[in-house]
């Protein structure tokens, strides 16, 4: 069955879906490859950051994440999403830019005493990175949406498939044309 969904690459759509706790837990569990037990958007936990040609949407969360010892650990999650192709050539430059933003825009998102995981969702390919989901430094995850189909991880691939811009409707780029069949029976994906 083919369905049309709002394109989550757009900030308003992405913000709306990530405000749903169940969707945020499903999405972040797939990215982090760890179970997110509970999640809360931080007060003032989203904003659009614009600097020259870079436009980034930022959300902050505090999450309880199941660790390897099967106990829960509170963690800050900072999620940055950009749909504009930036002149970021290397992940190190992107991470340096992120640190600059955090220093300049101390926004009080999250609890600074907690460990922080930063996730970058990029709607473009950067540098020579051929890995769709990469961890170039501890606590940093880069997701390159244009090459997500190359991921070998089925849960990441399924969740991130909702960003597949190859599904964009020709008539309206704000909509994606999605074959619902692969999600049949997966209650989290059906909800998403």
For each predicted feature, which ranges?
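Elongated, amphipathic alpha-helical interaction scaffolds
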Residues: 1-192
